[in-house]
UniProtKB/Swiss-Prot annotation:
Pfam families: MarB. Keywords: Antibiotic resistance. It comes from the Bacteria. Disulfide bonds: none annotated. This is Multiple antibiotic resistance protein MarB. It comes from Escherichia coli (strain K12). One of its GO terms (cellular component) is outer membrane-bounded periplasmic space.
């Protein structure tokens, strides 16, 4: 009988601790009234941190180097 009561007490403590962990101190407010979800473009990665990467230079899109556009 004693091992059964110990197991029940351990299960009670475990489940009550899990219930306390799931509670939040602030109420969760979600408003989805004016939300527009736009999928990312497949042409460019979302975070292109490499400024020397392919396709990130405007001269690639124009077909000529940008520094040759200005007359010296």
């Amino acid at each position: 009988m004693k091992p059964l009561s110990s197991a029940i007490a351990a299960a009670l403590i475990l489940f009550s601790a899990q219930g306390v962990a799931e509670q939040t101190t602030q109420p969760v407010v979600t408003s989805c009234a004016n939300v527009v979800v736009v999928p990312p473009s497949q042409e460019h990665p979302p975070f292109d941190l490499n400024h020397m990467g392919t396709g990130s230079d405007k001269s690639d899109a124009l077909g000529v180097p940008y520094y040759n556009q200005h007359a010296m």
